[in-house]
């Protein structure tokens, strides 16, 4: 088990059939979970629900848009917590990044993460409880690193993948950026690697 993604075993990127062609709806057991927990569709893919937002706030330094190197002080909640679920009908979390670090904790199922660092380094690792084969169940993604995820087949959770995410300082969409399609991906990792990762862009 590793909270440091750099220590996690590198995994080949081999999406399952339902990742390439999503199913029309989730299995009944996962649909029941979505209904019971009142999860909603996430704009990056998958389903989510915010379960806690700290009532306490803090002043943090945030880069000003435009890459000028300037910063501004903004107010953020001290932390936020969500459930995040991938299912066979919504099996991909598209590339995005946050200014702040995000802590991830596996709850059920299996998935795979792909990280793209500002220097173009790519790291991919599997998430699960099979530690002997290099899977991880908790990990931290640094701020400024693009991350994407996709579902891996598993019987124990009906091909679902459920995690918790903690953001410190708390999540705010002003701190969140989506990858700008394949062109930005090519700029970061080159055309050959971008072609391999295009399904996550």
Swiss-Prot record:
InterPro entries: Cupin_DUF985, RmlC-like_jellyroll, RmlC_Cupin_sf, YML079W-like. The lineage of its organism: Eukaryota, Fungi, Dikarya, Ascomycota, Saccharomycotina. This is Uncharacterized protein YML079W. GO terms for biological process: pyrimidine-containing compound metabolic process. Transmembrane segments: none annotated. One of its GO terms (cellular component) is nucleus. It holds the Pfam family Cupin_5. CDD domains: cupin_YML079wp (cd06121). Gene3D superfamilies: Jelly Rolls (2.60.120.10). Disulfide bonds: none annotated.
